[in-house]
Amino acid sequence: MRDDQIFNLIEKEKLREREHIELIASENFTSLEIRQAVGSILTNKYAEGYPLNRYYGGCSFIDEIETLAISRAKELFGAKYANVQPHSGSQANMAAIMALISPGDRILGMQLSHGGHLTHGSRVNFSGIFFNTYFYGVSRDSELIDYDEVLKIAKDCRPNLIIAGASSYSREIDFKKFREIADDVSAYLLCDIAHIAGLIVAGFHNSSIDVAHLTTSTTHKTLRGPRGGIILSGKDFDKLVNFNGKEKPLFNAVNSTVFPGTQGGPLVHVIAGKAIAFKEALQESFKEYIANVIKNTKVMAEYFKSEGFRIVSGGTDNHLFLVDLSSSDLTGADAEKLLESVNITLNKNAIPFDKKSPSLASGIRIGGAAITSRGLNESDSLNVAKFIVRALKAKSDIELKQIKKEVVRFIRDFDMP
């Protein structure tokens, strides 16, 4: 690379990733093969449109790549329809929402502070700006989704669309119950499985594909692919929907809202990376990987509990959990900064019914996907949890410096993918 400034910054980031314990639940490490595809000459090609229907010439091989990605996605998820063009999960959600409802319609989504996502109706996001939004949350007592309460809220607000899915909910989501609620109030159901896609395809979480009208996901996180989005559908893929005043099959509406509705040319180099990720996730080794992610995450959560920390909802069924720090002197922001000083990376996170602002937060979110990709097992994950607890309870900078040395020495033994 001739650009020394960028090269040196990339090298610094490479060293940071190697010498830090990565616990951000939305992050993971891709394979070298995926990185090679994303960094390939495919970035040169413009390919507006879809296979065999492009607005540019020279797309014959691009058509083959996208068709292969679609085929693998459908096989992996058991879907009848897949659009692999969304640049991100947020853009996948935007296109999916626009295919199902119109501006001014009503959306019922999960409260952001209870584990939802910005694109599920937040007032600062397109979903809350162009649509009328209502929210459900978790029970104050159990910190679990109360489906009876969701039904009650749905009957009160009569949404056109219900969004199921979360960014910081550590328990299994019952998508069938959400579909029953949606049918009860004549609403569409969109399931956002960005965080749990890997668990679903590996068989460790119930699938939304034949339950929801549309399912969206990112292709990174637990799926371990390149950064990007995807839209899927099962048995409802050809259901007729009212789109711009005309009846259209759902898949046609989605294709239109992705391109030209929300995007121009697809990122072909990323689509190639997605295709590789889907192939990797179809292997038996991926099921073993996800099983280990869940084991590692549970081990860490249980250790925190044994050390007197409260875990939101009491535990985890997936790849993440929230630690409640409200009884300590630390905010989530304090803990995030402190832990980064000892080479442990995670994020501050609001907890249900949080009294602190999101910029401070009362909790931290911990995920096990990335460390598992580096080969950490349950014993190693227990050591990670011990590092965190020691750092949170440290009384001096000398202690923190010692912990950092131990963290670096520990994590260097695990290769990057």
UniProtKB/Swiss-Prot annotation:
PTM annotation (N6-(pyridoxal phosphate)lysine): residues: 221
Compartment list: Cytoplasm
Signal sequence extent: none
A Pfam family reported for this protein in Swiss-Prot or TrEMBL: SHMT
Site entry: Plays an important role in substrate specificity: 220
Pathway info: One-carbon metabolism; tetrahydrofolate interconversion; Amino-acid biosynthesis; glycine biosynthesis; glycine from L-serine: step 1/1
Keywords per UniProt: Amino-acid biosynthesis, Cytoplasm, One-carbon metabolism, Pyridoxal phosphate, Transferase
EC number(s) on file: 2.1.2.1
Top-rank EC class of the record's enzyme: transferase
Catalytic reactions on record: (6R)-5,10-methylene-5,6,7,8-tetrahydrofolate + glycine + H2O = (6S)-5,6,7,8-tetrahydrofolate + L-serine
Gene Ontology biological-process annotations: glycine biosynthetic process from serine; tetrahydrofolate interconversion
Cofactor(s) named in the record: pyridoxal 5'-phosphate
MF terms (GO), sorted A to Z: glycine hydroxymethyltransferase activity; pyridoxal phosphate binding
GO cellular component: cytosol
Chief location of this protein within or outside the cell: cytoplasm
InterPro entries attached to this UniProt entry: PyrdxlP-dep_Trfase (IPR015424), PyrdxlP-dep_Trfase_major (IPR015421), PyrdxlP-dep_Trfase_small (IPR015422), Ser_HO-MeTrfase (IPR001085), Ser_HO-MeTrfase-like (IPR049943), Ser_HO-MeTrfase_PLP_BS (IPR019798), SHMT-like_dom (IPR039429)
Family named by the database record: Belongs to the SHMT family.
Complex formation: Homodimer.
Function: Catalyzes the reversible interconversion of serine and glycine with tetrahydrofolate (THF) serving as the one-carbon carrier. This reaction serves as the major source of one-carbon groups required for the biosynthesis of purines, thymidylate, methionine, and other important biomolecules. Also exhibits THF-independent aldolase activity toward beta-hydroxyamino acids, producing glycine and aldehydes, via a retro-aldol mechanism.
PANTHER family the record matches: SERINE HYDROXYMETHYLTRANSFERASE, SERINE HYDROXYMETHYLTRANSFERASE 1
Entry protein name: Serine hydroxymethyltransferase
